[in-house]
């Protein structure tokens, strides 16, 4: 549950594993590069806890394969977690574990309350849609179907990431990798989310 300090997000003892685990790795014995030497279970995320406060930028640092992306994708419901809890202040006033939310409520959280920028733009963009349509998809998912608003928001977002607004009808597949990443950043911001998840956001920039 969110504490009195009004954290935007609280994550407690997040677990994500591939495999059933065994007595050895469940007792938190040392692993070999996140893999149990006895049963072969891979622990992508193991007992991760942190808080995020309003206006705070929190970075998770670790070597390649240490689980940084897995944490982000778990919070965005791309992975089904093995255990742990996460409480979002904007969802049920931080009193309900979002990992226990229904699929319908998870879509609401993703569409209204969160934005996600993946390391690979292919995961966050529809490459055959125009940039404007990518933004519109996110805005419509957040229950806003006002065309004038979507047009204005498209111009605002493209200008913010220094992409010519005259290219808004072009699909991201026509853009360089860095431009694709900037379009993806804009799409994640389209619904003004209270929480923005960034997975190595500067890739290609």
Cite the ranges covered by each PLM segment.
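The feature captures the beta-strand-to-loop junction immediately N-terminal to the Walker
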Residues: 61-63
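Helix-to-loop junction immediately C-terminal to a conserved catalytic motif
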Residues: 76
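ABC ATPase NBD Q-loop/coupling interface
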Residues: 85-108
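Q-loop/switch helix immediately C-terminal to the Walker
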Residues: 120, 127-141
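Conserved ABC ATPase "signature" region
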Residues: 149-166
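Conserved ABC ATPase signature
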Residues: 171-175, 179
